[in-house]
Amino acid sequence: MRIALGISYSGSAYEGWQSQLSGKTVQDKLELALSRFAVQPIRVMCAGRTDAGVHALMQVVHFDTPLQRETSSWVRGTNAFLPSDIAVQWAQPVPDEFHSRASAIARRYAYVVLESPVRPSVEAGRVGWVYRPLDGDAMRQAALHLMGEHDFSSFRAAQCQAKSPVKTMSRIEISQRAGPGSRYWRFEFEANAFLHHMIRNIMGCLLAIGQGNHPPEWLAEVVAARRRDAAAPTFSPDGLYFLGPVYEERHGLPSRTAAYDWLP
């Protein structure tokens, strides 16, 4: 049978999602925990690979197993073997044709950025940081140039393995919440798929515009250039969260977890 799991994790201590020889990745820790609980080797496929330092609120994976166990057993049993910064949120049987990556019709990410004269301490790794004030209207105006279908080569990492740089951005929302002497900014992105470092490179551009280094129209020029050197430097992975994939309702999978509610 095929099982889907919803996984949340803090990426700060890991070398990204994808398995490596070092064993210091989220995939390695999850597969080890699943294999120990199932007492047999288990390999998983994920909805979207995350970089080192990037967090996930609802990564979705699937795996095949001959074992018949209650979904609650997969959750509690696997969590018993996972480190404290990785947790299975839910488990659900799915049809054999379901694929965590191929069945996803969209993917969602959020960036949380602290605007403050002082760098974060307690929130280190959980938020990005800028010390110069940001202009929300300018960033929202600039973001309009990213909506719809575009060739996103200007935001593509050199090591990106995607077959095509053409993606469709369906949603960008920028909001803020004020605190004493600071502001938390939340940037949400939804697209059919993302290129390697695409969001981090877009964030570098949006923040440059928000800080007054470029006008909003500059982002349209960056898109049109289709060259990585036309864009701003890649922003830090701190504060980047994979919110999860979007599936058709017929799959009946959860669309969010409680962890969404504590993001600024």
Swiss-Prot record:
The active site is at D51 (nucleophile). GO terms for molecular function: RNA binding; tRNA pseudouridine(38-40) synthase activity. Coiled coil: none annotated. It is an enzyme of class 5 (isomerase). Substrate binds at Y109. The keyword tRNA processing applies. Keywords: Isomerase, tRNA processing. Its EC number is 5.4.99.12. GO terms for biological process: tRNA pseudouridine synthesis. It catalyses: uridine(38/39/40) in tRNA = pseudouridine(38/39/40) in tRNA. Signal peptide: none annotated. Formation of pseudouridine at positions 38, 39 and 40 in the anticodon stem and loop of transfer RNAs. PANTHER family: PSEUDOURIDYLATE SYNTHASE, TRNA PSEUDOURIDINE SYNTHASE-LIKE 1. Homodimer. NCBIfam families: hisT_truA. Belongs to the tRNA pseudouridine synthase TruA family. HAMAP family: TruA. This is tRNA pseudouridine synthase A. The lineage of its organism: Bacteria, Pseudomonadati, Pseudomonadota, Betaproteobacteria, Burkholderiales.
